[in-house]
Amino acid sequence: MAKSGIYLGCFILILIQNMVAANPLFNRNNVQELENLKDLIHQLEERVAVNEEPEVYPESEDMKMDAEEEDAGISPGALRQSEENLLMNIVDRIAPESPLRSRFRDLAGLAKTAKSFNSCFGTRMDRIGSWSGLGCNSLKNGTKKKIFGN
């Protein structure tokens, strides 16, 4: 009876092993999915940016015609003044960054933070662990490090 209980306990432990195993959050597949998500966010941000951007030079055709007509009688001082006015109008027309764009940038930044912590303890602990051979990434490319000279 005791033997069957031990065998049954071992069998249950083997079955439950997959459920209890560690599943790192930022493994290769998840990082790749985050990169794909980042690309999609950038594409969406570009589309939103095209729809939101105000017209920077709305009167460019009128300005060309005026420039051709007044080309003969413009003084350099008046030309500088008109350029300064044009630059000030452009600055006034450019809208500040919208909350939607900042959200997209925040979401895109998640992939960067995920890459920096792609192991068990983070980059600093990986460096410490790689020297001692006890870290999460001590077994890379199928080669084993020897801790002691055995």
Swiss-Prot record:
Record keywords, A-Z: Disulfide bond, Hormone, Secreted, Signal, Vasoactive
Molecular-function GO term, any one: hormone activity
A biological-process GO annotation: cGMP-mediated signaling
Region annotation (Disordered) ranges: 52-75
Family per record: Belongs to the natriuretic peptide family.
Name of the molecule in the record: Ventricular natriuretic peptide
Keyword Ligase among record annotations: no
Domain of life, source organism: Eukaryota
Record organism: Anguilla japonica
Main location: secreted
GO cellular component: cytoplasm; extracellular space
InterPro entries the record matches: Natr_peptide, Natr_peptide_CS, Natriuretic_peptide, Natriuretic_peptide_atrial
Compartments reported by the entry: Secreted
Described function: Exhibits natriuretic and vasodepressor activity.
UniProt signal peptide: 1-21
Tissue: Heart ventricle, and to a lower extent in heart atrium.
Disulfide bonds: 120-136
